[in-house]
């Protein structure tokens, strides 16, 4: 077998149908679009139209709302923090805050602040500055001999300047 003799199996590649090329092609005249009217035109179609029946998106009740003042925190668990300390990406003697966590690659971005969660256990004595923490996380840090400082939340996103 030579490199120039390599080819696909017969029938592995199917030629596309060329539409609108005469009656003999089998896809001529209307080109598979049926009769005349809105659906025969390109780009025009009423989305969600059900032939006069009340559309599904109008039959269902409206629910909920989006709070524009909601703050989204990046969450980090204690076990993730301990893994970073073990891997020496974070210095346990320095103050751990959102900027240091992002710089170390533990978090991708800090969003509206960092929230500390209590999964896992901590072996190192840490000084942590976060925007929120659970009771169990604070207890675990203090049990290891460290301290947690809760920072004031960042300014609201919805306020006009």
Swiss-Prot record:
Organism whose genome encodes this protein: Rhodopseudomonas palustris (strain BisB5)
Alphabetical list of PANTHER family matching this protein: 50S RIBOSOMAL PROTEIN L15 (PTHR12934), LARGE RIBOSOMAL SUBUNIT PROTEIN UL15M (PTHR12934:SF11)
Gly residues bias spans: 21-37
Quaternary structure, from the entry: Part of the 50S ribosomal subunit.
Function, in words: Binds to the 23S rRNA.
Gene name of the encoded protein: rplO
Record family assignment: Belongs to the universal ribosomal protein uL15 family.
Gene3D superfamilies per the UniProt record, alphabetical: 3.100.10.10
InterPro entries given in the database record: Ribosomal_uL15, Ribosomal_uL15/eL18, Ribosomal_uL15/eL18_sf, Ribosomal_uL15_bac-type, Ribosomal_uL15_CS
Disulfide bonds: none
Identification of the protein by name: Large ribosomal subunit protein uL15
Lineage: Bacteria, Pseudomonadati, Pseudomonadota, Alphaproteobacteria, Hyphomicrobiales
Gene Ontology CC annotations of this record: cytosolic large ribosomal subunit
Positions of region (Disordered): 1-43
One Pfam family of this chain: Ribosomal_L27A
Biological process annotations from GO: translation
Example of a GO MF term: rRNA binding
Magnesium is among the record's keywords: no
Keyword rRNA-binding in annotation: yes
């Amino acid at each position: 077998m030579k490199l120039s003799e390599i080819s696909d199996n017969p029938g592995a590649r199917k030629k596309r149908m060329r539409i609108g090329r005469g009656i003999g092609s089998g896809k001529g005249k209307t080109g598979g679009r049926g009769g005349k009217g809105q659906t025969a035109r390109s780009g025009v179609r009423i989305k969600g139209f059900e032939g006069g029946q009340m559309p599904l998106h109008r039959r269902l009740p409206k629910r909920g709302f989006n709070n524009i003042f909601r703050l989204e925190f990046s969450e980090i668990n204690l076990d993730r923090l301990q893994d970073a300390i073990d891997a020496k990406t974070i210095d346990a003697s320095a103050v751990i805050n959102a900027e240091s966590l992002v710089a170390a690659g533990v978090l991708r971005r800090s969003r509206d602040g960092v929230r500390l969660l209590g999964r896992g256990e901590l072996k190192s004595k840490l000084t942590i500055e976060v925007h929120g923490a659970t009771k169990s996380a604070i207890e675990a840090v203090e049990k290891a001999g460290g301290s947690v400082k809760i920072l004031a939340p960042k300014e609201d996103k919805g306020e006009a300047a």
